[in-house]
Amino acid sequence: GISLDGIGAVHDKFRGVKGSFEQAVRGFKLCSEVGQKTGLRLTLTRNNVQCMDQILDFIDANDIQRVCFYHLVPTGRGVEVQTLTQEEARNAMDTLIARVEEWKAEGKNREVLTVTQPADGIYLLLRQLREGSPLAKETLNLLQWNGGGANSSGRGIANIDTQGVVHPDQFWQSVTLGNVKNNLFSDLWD
């Protein structure tokens, strides 16, 4: 996926490079021209949450089929970026859910994920139950299947860092399962 940090000047300011948004847009267009499926990745922060509608418009206008919205996990450079308040996170989810429902009604089947916040699935389920959505049962089944997203670490996904060290996922760098330079991955993962 191609990373965006907002639309236009918001992206450029975060990246510290004027014109970097246009370079990302060019990347999407070039991938599309050669038939390369390309997704969009964006970490929600206080610096870009106000662009949510514009980001969703961009996704629609560029016919992007897979989108990952990450909730900020403040580490490294992210420590300096403000995480969303609970209200901002819920508003972002409401905006996202409403747009996905519009896309679905229009026959646009996009894969939209939210990452690093297992509460998003529960929030969606509670909203569906409140609205009497026929999708609530399917959502509940998916949440039960993957443990709400919290149980996939070390089971459904793994992270192998640049040194060959195996971690339960990309966010559990403090937990080491071994090194693929010394052991077969299948021995470490079994």
Positions of PLM-derived features:
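Anionic group-transfer/hydrolysis microenvironments
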Residues: 5-7, 163, 170
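Short, small/polar residue-rich loop motifs at catalytic or cofactor-binding pockets
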Residues: 151-154
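Short, P/G- and charge-enriched loop/turn segments at secondary-structure junctions
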Residues: 142-147
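Short, electropositive alpha-helical surface patch
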Residues: 49-66, 121-141
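A structural motif corresponding to the C-terminal end of an alpha-helix
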Residues: 26-38, 62, 95-111, 162
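C-terminal accessory region of radical SAM enzymes
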Residues: 88-138, 165-190
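Radical SAM/AdoMet-radical enzyme domain recognition
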Residues: 1-87
